[in-house]
Design a protein with these regions (language model features):
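Interfacial loop-to-transmembrane junctions
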Residues: 228-251
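Hydrophobic transmembrane alpha-helical segments of multi-pass transport and channel proteins
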Residues: 213-218, 245-253
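Short helical (or helix-break) motifs at transmembrane helix termini and adjacent helical loops
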Residues: 145-155, 216-228
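Juxtamembrane boundary at the C-terminal end of a transmembrane helix
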Residues: 261-267
């Protein structure tokens, strides 16, 4: 019941932000999501005695809120510069011995900036593309409906265990999730082709749907692998019935950059 109630609150919020909100609203929303995710990720690693540099991750997450405030020409350089600037700051901290940070902590902090901030930043990039208001829903369809169909298929016919990283996942569930999400992506494409004037090739979008669904499941398992390493069940109890923010967007984190890349390459 908690899971359903949480979804009933979160779904309208996402719909409002991504349908009614402009680019800047989406940027702020994704920046807040990234901030929470960075907090949860670093907290997970701290359970194993690591000391990631939180403020570097927080600053990188806040940067998402401003990527469309500055002129586009300069924004590209700002995005590219996040990684080298972050690494430089981290090594300065180690070399000057100002904190407990060591090389492993640098790697974890750098990983957090890439995994959370840069990957989620593609949500803001997609929404700012031509027809981005329509394209962004491929991310959500691939993420949400893979989860839904994987759960339903696994419950109905799941017999073969998939991986120890996530004991409840079955091979049948994974396949069912991909097939169900891909069919929904095809249906969405047919609808926007007919009613919004798009001309997206259904065969190509079918391939993209399969890839995005698989990538999303890898994202889910990757987040689970980190939890397993940290010895935690959920990243937090922020969202009743769902766990933390990372638990809720783990597949979106992986799907977003691949959605952008595949649409750039194939259309």
């Amino acid at each position: 019941m908690k899971r359903v109630l949480s979804a009933a609150v979160l779904l309208p919020l996402v719909l409002i932000v991504f349908i009614l909100g402009n680019t800047y609203v989406v940027d702020v929303f994704m920046g807040i999501v990234a901030l929470r995710c960075i907090y949860e990720l670093f907290h997970a690693f701290e359970q194993k005695g690591h000391h990631p540099v939180r403020w570097v991750g927080y600053l990188a997450a806040i940067a998402i809120m401003f990527i469309h405030v500055i002129p586009e020409h300069y924004a590209k350089y700002a995005v590219i510069s996040i990684i080298p600037i972050s690494v430089l700051i981290l090594f300065i901290l180690v070399l000057t011995k100002k904190t407990k940070t060591d090389v492993i902590d640098i790697a974890i902090t750098f990983f957090g900036v890439c995994y959370i901030v840069l990957f989620l930043m593609f949500m803001s990039i997609i929404i700012n593309m031509e027809n981005g208001k329509f394209l962004i829903w491929y991310v959500f369809i691939a993420s949400w409906l893979t989860d839904v169909f994987a759960y339903l298929t696994g419950k109905a016919i799941g017999k073969h265990h998939f991986t120890d990283i996530s004991p409840n996942k079955t091979i049948e569930g994974c396949i069912g999730g991909t097939l169900g999400a891909t069919l929904c992506i095809i249906l969405y494409t047919v609808l926007i082709n007919k009613f919004a004037g798009f001309n997206i090739n259904v065969a190509v979008i079918s391939l993209i749907g399969i890839i995005l669904s698989i990538v999303g499941q890898i994202g889910d398992l990757s987040a689970s692998a980190i939890k397993r390493y940290a010895g935690i069940k959920d990243y937090s109890d922020l969202i009743p019935g769902h766990g933390g923010m990372v638990d809720r967007v783990d597949s979106v984190i992986f799907i977003a950059p691949f959605t952008y890349l595949l649409f750039i390459l194939m259309f």
